[in-house]
Amino acid sequence: MNTATGVIALLVLATVIGCIEAEDTRADLQGGEAAEKVFRRSPTCIPSGQPCPYNENYCSQSCTFKENENANTVKRCD
């Protein structure tokens, strides 16, 4: 495997693992809202059984309260 092929393979792997998807933004030289939205996570990244984020749309299905290994009730993706 040459260097170029290795770099391409690493970029593809990083994209798949991170579920990163580019979002269209306008140029913002002030560091405002557009600068913060260059990348966003795909809504299908969080698999079943993982903790729910604040925005439930990031779960693959829905969120429900479940008991974790410490007997605490937490929200998990279904």
From Swiss-Prot:
Under Pfam families, the record lists: Omega-toxin (PF06357)
What tissue expression does the UniProt record report for this protein?
A: Expressed by the venom gland.
Q: What is the lineage of its organism?
A: Eukaryota, Metazoa, Ecdysozoa, Arthropoda, Chelicerata
Subcellular location(s): the record lists:
Secreted
**Which residues carry the site feature described as Critical for insecticidal activity?**
P51, N68, R76
Propeptide segment residues: 23-41
Q: Which InterPro entries match?
A: Omega-atracotox, Omega-atracotox_CS
Q: Which UniProt keywords apply?
A: Calcium channel impairing toxin, Cleavage on pair of basic residues, Disulfide bond, Ion channel impairing toxin, Knottin, Neurotoxin, Secreted, Signal, Toxin, Voltage-gated calcium channel impairing toxin, Voltage-gated sodium channel impairing toxin
* Signal peptide coordinates: 1-22
| Gene Ontology biological process terms in this record | defense response
Enumerate the GO terms in the molecular function aspect.
Answer: calcium channel inhibitor activity; sodium channel regulator activity; toxin activity
GO CC terms, sorted? extracellular region
Disulfide cross-links: C45-C59, C52-C63
Coiled-coil zones: none
Q: Give the similarity note.
A: Belongs to the neurotoxin 08 (Shiva) family. 01 (omega toxin) subfamily.
Q: What is known of its domains?
A: The presence of a 'disulfide through disulfide knot' structurally defines this protein as a knottin.
Name of the protein in its database record: Omega-hexatoxin-Ar1c
Q: Which domain of life is it from?
A: Eukaryota
